[in-house]
UniProtKB/Swiss-Prot annotation:
<keyword id="KW-0997">Cell inner membrane</keyword>
<keyword id="KW-0139">CF(1)</keyword>
<comment type="similarity">
    <text>Belongs to the ATPase epsilon chain family.</text>
</comment>
<keyword id="KW-0066">ATP synthesis</keyword>
<dbReference type="GO" id="GO:0045259">
    <property type="term" value="C:proton-transporting ATP synthase complex"/>
</dbReference>
<dbReference type="InterPro" id="IPR001469">
    <property type="entry name" value="ATP_synth_F1_dsu/esu"/>
</dbReference>
<keyword id="KW-1003">Cell membrane</keyword>
<dbReference type="Pfam" id="PF02823">
    <property type="entry name" value="ATP-synt_DE_N"/>
</dbReference>
<comment type="function">
    <text>Produces ATP from ADP in the presence of a proton gradient across the membrane.</text>
</comment>
<dbReference type="InterPro" id="IPR036771">
    <property type="entry name" value="ATPsynth_dsu/esu_N"/>
</dbReference>
<keyword id="KW-0813">Transport</keyword>
<dbReference type="GO" id="GO:0005524">
    <property type="term" value="F:ATP binding"/>
</dbReference>
<dbReference type="GO" id="GO:0046933">
    <property type="term" value="F:proton-transporting ATP synthase activity, rotational mechanism"/>
</dbReference>
<comment type="subunit">
    <text>F-type ATPases have 2 components, CF(1) - the catalytic core - and CF(0) - the membrane proton channel. CF(1) has five subunits: alpha(3), beta(3), gamma(1), delta(1), epsilon(1). CF(0) has three main subunits: a, b and c.</text>
</comment>
<keyword id="KW-0472">Membrane</keyword>
<keyword id="KW-0406">Ion transport</keyword>
<dbReference type="InterPro" id="IPR020546">
    <property type="entry name" value="ATP_synth_F1_dsu/esu_N"/>
</dbReference>
């Protein structure tokens, strides 16, 4: 099975570093998916969520305010200005990380419809876990 390695890095440190099945990124021209053996490219990323599918088909979510993605055949490196890994072992931890993600995205998004759609998608992915 082909592997895809994903790294998400901010000025504060590494947010994510693991092998994944696929990743959906908020590109500046629209969302796009990346699978193993994807063509090489560099893309600007806008405020939104990164939907990560691991090898067990479980989805994780990372919210970013903006950044760049460098994609090679087997590796995706995301350099983000700010990012929040939406996770938690309890309902309160999950609620806190969701709120931090909302605040991060809201600080960069002037389009209220796009903001609402992004938040709704993020909440749906988290609920589906």
């Amino acid at each position: 099975m082909d592997k895809l390695h994903l790294e998400i890095v901010t000025p504060q440190g590494q947010i994510f570093n693991d092998d994944v099945s696929s990743v959906v990124l908020p590109g500046s021209e629209g969302e796009f998916g990346v699978l193993p053996n994807h063509a090489s490219l560099i893309s600007l990323l806008k405020a939104g969520i990164i939907d990560i599918e691991d090898k067990h088909k479980k989805h994780d979510v990372v919210a970013i305010n903006w950044g760049y993605a460098k994609i090679d055949e087997g590796k995706v490196v995301i350099l983000a200005d700010g990012a929040v890994y939406v996770s938690g072992n309890s309902e309160s931890e999950l609620a806190n990380s969701l709120e931090a993600a909302r605040n991060l995205i809201e600080s960069m998004s002037s389009d209220t419809n796009a903001f609402a759609a992004t938040i709704s998608k993020m909440e749906n992915v988290v609920r589906a876990r």
